[in-house]
Regions:
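Short, charged/polar surface micro-motifs in flexible loops or helix N-caps
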Residues: 51-54, 75-76
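Long, charge-dense, solvent-exposed interaction surfaces that engage phosphate-rich ligands
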Residues: 109-130
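Short, structured patches in soluble enzyme cores that scaffold and shape functional sites
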Residues: 10, 71-73, 132, 152, ...
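Accessory RNA 3′-end/elbow-binding domains used by RNA modification enzymes
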Residues: 1-13, 17-38, 42-45, 63, ...
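Pepsin-like aspartyl protease folds
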Residues: 133-152, 191-199
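Acidic, low-complexity central loop/insert segments
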Residues: 59-114
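Pseudouridine synthase
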Residues: 126, 156-197
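Phosphate-centric recognition/catalysis
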Residues: 48
């Protein structure tokens, strides 16, 4: 079973799961997963992994995430996008400086409500399930906007590029931008350009080592101990500080955690193939 890590480009109006199913058929691989669900109406970068590499998602460099979005002022939809639009109201035209100032006001750390219709889990429950009891109204998530810039303003459409932390919903951000301009707003277009170090390159196979958000450590004893999953001694490692590391050996690598002078395997015997 070949381990593969690559970036696919999800088309618009297809769910991430349905797109994954098509990739499974294309590559004839049963065990395949993705990181970072894209809304059905959104398109762009989706990190794909197969077999053993599906266990690596939480260790990858996936932040910041960069998007290009188009916001339509004056439109209202509970989904905050082009699905189920309930009404459109005429909105006054703004000057460019007002738009830029409004966008820049969202830079930095902040709290955000996930959209009512989303797959985000809050306290172990999906946001759309919490919505039924209005619980979601009190559930905010911490996010950060690293960069945001105006690409084009052709009233009532604002197109902007934004780089954010994991967990940020661009639909919610678009709604908040519109609200700050004293109107409703929905996204009419959303494309994810990259997830941290990951960008679309025609599904090119990637070396996972280059994308791990971990420091390399070095095992100074017999690699056979790693291969057999034997108990590890902290004195056999070059770096002995607390932390999570990857260790290469033969044609494999392991992910270990050092804490309180003890070494624990997080993952082991992951075969390198790229």
């Amino acid at each position: 079973m070949e381990n593969i890590l690559f970036v696919a480009k999800k088309p618009m109006f297809v769910s991430s799961n349905k797109f994954l199913s098509s990739l499974k058929k294309k590559y004839n691989i049963k065990k395949m997963g993705f990181s970072g669900t894209l809304d059905p109406f959104a398109c762009g970068c989706l990190i794909i992994a197969t077999n053993q590499y599906t266990k690596l998602f939480k260790y990858l460099k996936k932040t910041p995430k960069t998007y290009i979005a188009t916001l339509m002022l004056g439109a209202y939809s509970k989904t905050l996008d082009i699905e189920k639009i309930e009404y459109i109201k005429e909105v006054k035209t703004f000057d460019i400086e007002t738009i830029k100032k409004t966008l820049n006001s969202f830079l930095g750390k902040q709290t955000q409500h996930p959209p009512i219709y989303s797959a985000k889990k809050i306290d172990g429950k999906r946001a759309y399930k919490l919505k039924k009891d209005d619980i979601y109204l009190d559930k905010k998530v911490e996010i950060e906007v690293f960069d945001i810039k105006l690409i084009n303003y052709s009233h009532p459409f604002i197109t902007f590029e934004v780089s954010v932390s994991e967990g940020c919903y661009i639909r919610s951000l678009g709604c908040d931008i519109a609200n700050k301009l004293m109107c409703e707003g929905i996204l009419t277009y959303l494309e994810r350009i990259n997830e941290g170090e990951f960008k679309y390159e025609c599904e090119k196979k990637l070396n996972p080592i280059e994308y791990l958000n971990l420091k390399e450590n070095f095992y100074l004893n017999d690699n056979k101990n790693l291969e057999l999953g034997k108990k590890l001694n902290i004195n056999d490692f070059k770096i002995q500080k607390n932390g999570t590391y990857y260790v290469k050996y033969n044609n494999f690598f392991a992910i270990i955690e050092i804490e309180k002078q003890k070494v624990v395997y997080k993952l082991n015997k992951i075969r390198l193939s790229y």
